[in-house]
Amino acid sequence: MGRFDQRWVSVVVLAAGIALLPGLLYLFGLALVEGRPQPADRAPSGVAACSSEPRTGFQPMNPWSFATQFFDDDAMKKKVPEVEREAFWIARRHLWRQPRHDMVRWHLSSTALTIWITRNWSAAQIADTARKEDFCRAWSKRRAPDGPMKR
């Protein structure tokens, strides 16, 4: 094999590795999680939704779209959809119930589990579970104009 062929193979292998990296990190992050959370059957009646934001047209996350957000200035400025935020809360709560690990494993597994939840649960299941776990009340206190998260 000539020098040109070796360089070409190296470039192809490098490009394939970069393209596969988000998916491999997602699978590794899921492997770090013990079990998977179960969606709530229905939220208790009388418990308000976290947001009046419409849940139609919800697009499940995937490892590649998540990774590309870091390179897209417009995506970084956009508000995170409530469904994704609620999925993150659910993932975080599930991980709190497991043995603690270092920060890199925590972030990798919470991101992977958030992606998994958005891909395997409906928007209604995510909302019902967030309401049942009482995430909405805690979040609304932080968002209140005079709440603890005031800037």
Predicted regions located by residue number:
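Juxtamembrane regions of bacterial inner-membrane/periplasmic proteins
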Residues: G2-R151
